[in-house]
Amino acid sequence: MSQAHTPSAPLAEVYDVAVVGGGINGVGIAADAAGRGLSVFLCEQHDLAQHTSSASSKLIHGGLRYLEHYEFRLVREALAEREVLLAKAPHIVKPLRFVLPHRPHLRPAWMIRAGLFLYDHLGKREKLPASRGLRFTGSSPLKAEIRRGFEYSDCAVDDARLVVLNAISAREHGAHVHTRTRCVSARRSKGLWHLHLERSDGSLYSIRARALVNAAGPWVARFIQDDLKQKSPYGIRLIQGSHIIVPKLYEGEHAYILQNEDRRIVFAIPYLDRFTMIGTTDREYQGDPAKVAISEEETAYLLQVVNAHFKQQLAAADILHSFAGVRPLCDDESDEPSAITRDYTLSLSAGNGEPPLLSVFGGKLTTYRKLAESALTQLQPFFANLGPAWTAKAPLPGGEQMQSVEALTEQLANRYAWLDRELALRWARTYGTRVWRLLDGVNGEADLGEHLGGGLYAREVDYLCKHEWAQDAEDILWRRSKLGLFLSPSQQVRLGQYLQSEHPHRPRVHAA
């Protein structure tokens, strides 16, 4: 493939669609639109997936608890999307069994069985096994009084990589993707949108577009009010969700879904083979979405829920890492944060022949692809040349000709006998079949360059900077990879030094 780079957009260029926001919804819409033949520009004020999209529970799931709120349409769509995404991205999406311990005073067994029956049959389920009842023995990690439970299927995903892969797909279909670029203002003039943009170095430029998509996530309403000088058609409620990561709490590759006295649920999920991720919380958030952080109350809450279920008791000192994000949910006036709909709402503004503004409110990681299709359906009247929907069967980058992570790991081990098995597995899970591009021209370990710690080599860092918009250590350690837990503080400092030396400023990204 050619090494053509994404150029700085000249002032006079006109795009079909400009997308503001580099989270999962923004990149999903950009990829879908570009694949249908539209010229697309996307800007993200920080890094791809830097906020909400990398702070999720990292699940592709129907949302079992949404059935209690009668969200049947959302659950049906999400359940069907599990199978679609499992086929599109088998390297970053994997089946996961969930164990639900039964606590009779919270929900009776008949209610759980009924919910799981619906969950098994509401959506298309071909690859994932059905739910079943369980009996726990003395060897269970759960407390002795918890003797019965249920088990069902969903999927786990690397959330930030799902975003990056969609951005790569958009770029490979011709889209221009600009990170660290903020849309300062946008206005309609002479049938076009005029966007004024500011790079992280303070330089300014402008573009024009025939349609504007506001996928700014937590900033969606603020963008309409402050940057477009209009009234937002919907209110947004920012709901904080926080997670903690602790050393591996139990053996096995299954997750737990834990019921709490407040009728909320908390997940305990295997994380990077060595850890357990616990979350999430639900509470209103009023501050700057970019500065959200877990509170002491949330930490205590998560520990209390886990300690009510497991024999092994956790304390705050056991927490290795925490992360928090805000979910920008469409305000449906629900009393409780956990009851607010996770469904998405699209708002189209295009009166009197004006160029359209499409704003995205709400949504969840699992249904991003369907949201993007819905967005393109709304924009279709404005683009006579719009191609048909295409994303359902198209693999995401790295999912092409991919049998399984295990088979790809075996191929890597056979071709590169010197390659550490654990590293081969991580690369297969991270890059899928694109790993062959990462290793192009590599004949031995020396060709990987400096080992920066935790299985991270200079070769991979260079690849991420050149092909995946990475610019600083956080981009690499917490989003492109999840190696932040594996590098010591001094190794992280060395990575920063390497980036400053070898990649001091890389606003352009070459085609992969």
UniProtKB/Swiss-Prot annotation:
Predominant location category: cytoplasm
Entry's Gene Ontology cellular component terms: cytoplasm
Cofactor(s) for this UniProt protein: FAD
Catalytic activity reported: a quinone + sn-glycerol 3-phosphate = dihydroxyacetone phosphate + a quinol
Top-level taxon in the UniProt lineage: Bacteria
EC nos: 1.1.5.3
Keyword terms: Cytoplasm, FAD, Flavoprotein, Glycerol metabolism, Oxidoreductase
Name used for this protein in its record: Glycerol-3-phosphate dehydrogenase
Lineage: Bacteria, Pseudomonadati, Pseudomonadota, Gammaproteobacteria, Pseudomonadales
Gene: glpD
